[in-house]
Curated annotation (Swiss-Prot):
Protein's name according to its UniProt entry: 1-deoxy-D-xylulose 5-phosphate reductoisomerase
Binding site for 1-deoxy-D-xylulose 5-phosphate: K128, S152, E153, S177, H200, S213, N218, K219, E222
Binding site for NADPH: T21, G22, S23, I24, G47, N127, E129, G206
Sites where the protein binds Mn(2+): D151, E153, E222
One biological process term in Gene Ontology: isopentenyl diphosphate biosynthetic process, methylerythritol 4-phosphate pathway involved in terpenoid biosynthetic process
Catalytic activity: 2-C-methyl-D-erythritol 4-phosphate + NADP(+) = 1-deoxy-D-xylulose 5-phosphate + NADPH + H(+)
Cofactor list: Mg(2+); Mn(2+)
Keyword Manganese: yes
Pathway participation: Isoprenoid biosynthesis; isopentenyl diphosphate biosynthesis via DXP pathway; isopentenyl diphosphate from 1-deoxy-D-xylulose 5-phosphate: step 1/6
Gene3D superfamilies documented for this protein: 1.10.1740.10, NAD(P)-binding Rossmann-like Domain (3.40.50.720)
Catalytic EC class: oxidoreductase
EC code: 1.1.1.267
Length: 413
């Protein structure tokens, strides 16, 4: 079906929220509830792990147009019109909406992203993995301006780019908090626990995004996303560490001037802007208080200790499905770390190992199946690496650090 962003006759925009029970989804519903004159929820989709939250959302919004991926969870709730692995995609295809917020986690968001673009609805994209994995496939499906980013960094870039024309842009600068391990050495990272990796210093996010931020993989994904969204070459996309997370991104222009977007860390601001784009939502978040003394720090990223960003850049330059390989390898390695099967440095070590062997995937995808094949290959390769490292760890229980040394070997490959 063909949708538009004209909204209802009363001017309200009809919004479908995918990933409604997650961090971004719950905050988006708060923004919508606070602005009933601007937005109306017309569909919800969730995995099914947080049924109490979903039931509460159904009661609060009155929405019965709901998708749940987990079949058993859908049966427990009852009266769920869309259920199963393709539930979110079918919900998008069958719902008249002006905006689809894709806040699903991981590359499983690819088909819903493509479905949303096909309907003509504006895609408020928090699920960066679908763009990273789909790459040119997603870009070909989108009309100009149809994708509006939800990530704070890309929302900031979109705002800053209003200050000049495309040919006036010299470079884009993404900021990174540095995560919970800023300033740590490679040796320090050998002993990181999932609990430590789940404690972000400035942002409140879901567990996978928090872990990806700790490893700096999230920033690597954002570099790829920046290139795809704004068409700027990788060698003109910089990353700088800014621990306070007040400046979210900057654009430097050819005359030497730099425009930055600043606001306290609150995802409701970029969420509200993506929902209402190009109009802002009054009172979406608190503004900076310049009457209170503060200092903003900037420092270079230590790419030796945190090589994930440079690996992402290499995958992006290689092109084709290599960014899908990067993302899929990370998803498998991150899950293994959270399960206690590998050490923290091994996450990026496995990504490096998989990319090193992935030359065959440096071709542009023609179909979704091409992307899925690349991801399947990367997952299987990563799983073999995890199994090998776990075997080394078991065989070397009397030799602490053996698994970590194996991870370092992979990282250098």
């Amino acid at each position: 079906m063909t949708n538009s962003t004209d909204g209802r006759a009363d001017g309200r925009l009809r919004v479908v929220v995918l990933g409604s029970t997650g961090s971004i989804g719950t905050q988006a519903l708060q923004v919508i509830a606070d602005n009933p004159d601007r937005f109306e929820v017309v569909g919800l989709a969730a995995g099914g792990a947080h049924l109490d939250t979903l039931l509460r959302q159904r009661a609060q919004t009155g929405v019965t147009n709901i998708a749940v991926a987990d079949e058993h969870a859908a049966q427990r709730v009852g009266d769920i019109p869309y259920h199963g692995s393709d539930a979110a995609t079918r919900l998008v295809e069958q719902t008249e909406a002006d905006v689809v917020l894709n806040a699903l986690v991981g590359a499983l968001g690819l088909r819903p992203t493509l479905a949303a673009l096909k309907t003509g609805a504006r895609l408020a994209l928090a699920n960066k993995e679908s763009l990273v994995a789909g790459g040119s496939l997603v870009l070909r499906a989108a009309r100009p301006g149809q994708i509006v980013p939800v990530d704070s960094e890309h929302s900031a870039l979109a705002q800053c780019l209003r200050g000049g024309t495309p040919d006036e842009v010299a470079k884009l600068v993404l900021t990174a908090s540095g995560g919970p391990f800023r300033g740590w050495s490679a040796a320090d990272l050998e002993h990181v626990t999932p609990e430590q990796a789940g404690a972000h210093p400035t942002w409140s996010m879901g567990p996978m995004n928090t872990l990806n931020s700790a490893s700096l993989v999230n920033k690597g994904l954002e570099v790829i996303e920046t290139h795809l969204l704004f068409g700027i070459p990788y060698d003109r996309i910089d990353v700088v560490v800014h621990p306070q997370s007040i400046i979210h991104s900057m654009v430097t222009f050819i005359d030497g001037s730099t425009i930055a977007q600043a606001s306290p860390p609150d995802m409701k601001l970029p969420i509200s802007l993506a929902l209402g784009w190009p109009r802002r939502v009054s009172g979406a978040a608190a503004a900076c208080d310049f009457h209170t003394a503060s200092s903003w720090e900037f420092e270079p990223l230590d790419t030796d200790v945190f090589p994930a960003v440079e690996l992402a850049r290499q995958a992006g330059v290689a092109g084709g499905c290599m960014t899908a390989v990067y993302n899929a390898a990370n998803e498998e390695a991150a899950a293994a770390f959270l399960a206690g099967r590998i050490g923290f440095p091994a996450i990026v070590g496995i990504i490096a190992d998989v990319l090193h062997a992935a030359d065959q995937w440096a071709v542009e995808p023609a179909t979704v199946d091409d992307v899925l094949d690349a991801q399947r290959w990367a997952r299987e390769r990563a799983q073999r690496a995890v199994s090998g490292m776990a075997s080394v760890a078991i065989a070397s229980t009397a030799k602490p650090g053996a698994a970590g040394r194996h991870a370092s070997t992979l990282e250098r490959s």
